[in-house]
Amino acid sequence: MSFGALSANALRALNIAAARGGFAQVTGEGGLTPYHLHGGGDIIWEIGSGYFGTRTSGGQFDPHRFADKAAHEQVKAISLKLSQGAKPGVGGVLPASKVRAEIAEYRGVPVGEKCVSPCGAFRVPHPAGDDRIRGPDA
């Protein structure tokens, strides 16, 4: 689950448990934070339709932010959340009152503004996008 849905302490504890147990922790779609990395455990970085943590200020996929985070030694896999199935046609919404500075920083969204995870399917921004996500050495 994402930072915000879970506290910093909960994410730290989960990552320590993942490291000790030999399993991976999933970030949730809210982005990769230092709290997910705290215990040295393996990470499955989830990217959803809102591109949180890997987006431009305009909300588009940012291949440079993606590459920087994907290269982290603890990130062992990347999960692409293809759509918001729990709320078809609506998407997920984090109310503006919950978008504090720290959450805004990790998600790459403005502080104090409603944060929407679109219901639409995950889009690769260019026909060659699969190669950009995979990287040149894949």
Regions found by a protein language model. Give the residues of each.
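Active-site entrance/lid segments in N-terminal catalytic domains of soluble metabolic enzymes
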Residues: 1-138
